[in-house]
Amino acid sequence: KHGAMTYLDEVHAVGLYGSRGGGVSEERGLADRITLIEGTLGKAYGCVGGYVAGSAALCDFLRSFSSGFIFTTALPPAVAAAATVSIRHLKESNAERMAQRRQVKLLRDLLDQRGIPHLPNPSHIIPVMIKDPTKCRMLSDILMQDYGIYVQPINYPTVPKGTERLRFTPSPLHTDADIMNLVDALTVLWRQCALAHAVA
């Protein structure tokens, strides 16, 4: 309507959304309306590197003027080959996407059953709300040291003060037992740290 350029960061979505893993823009039928799409070869694709997709002129401009790109080197051939195979696989297979959705739903349901507050959203990323930077870091450390569960604490300035959280992303390779172990650990730590429970 206004002729604006649109830039979409799909790093959390490629491989996971859309019938062929093209991301939210594919899932919603908007890919042809986006000026520039940024994605990653990490996360769902399990490799390293990233990309931008747009017109030839815009991509050429970025190659010439993006300070983060100008002095970089190309991906090693083995990484590029692995990424290509991964992309091809996820374009054809829905099994991984469906398995992840199942595990995301399981974790959300178990958190709800235990009264552990998390932000409701349509994403596969589940932010468990701690709302205290010291406790957020402490919980992250204890989960790693005592339970072997790695989770990154998300504190200010990444999020506003008072909204500190642990951010969980279940994968299709996490078993039901893995998710139950996580929820059991969070239940124990919630009680030990006297954190507020969600209101039903």
What is each residue range found by the language model?
Residues 97-108, 112-148, 156, 163, ...:
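Conserved PLP-binding catalytic core of the aspartate aminotransferase-like
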Residues 61-62, 139, 178, 182:
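Hydrophobic side chains in well-ordered alpha-helices
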Residues 9, 44, 159-161:
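Short glycine/serine/proline-enriched coil/turn segments at secondary-structure junctions
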Residues 3, 133, 198-200:
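N-terminal glycine-rich, Lys/His-bearing helix-loop that initiates the first secondary-structure elements
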Residues 39-40, 47-49, 73, 128, ...:
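Thr-Gly-centered strand-to-loop micro-motif
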Residues 145-146, 157-200:
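PLP-dependent enzyme catalytic core of the Aspartate aminotransferase-like
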Residues 8-9, 121, 153-154, 200:
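Residue-level detector of family-conserved "landmark" positions at structurally sensitive sites
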Residues 2-5, 12, 17-122, 135:
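Active-site C-terminal subdomain of aminotransferase-like
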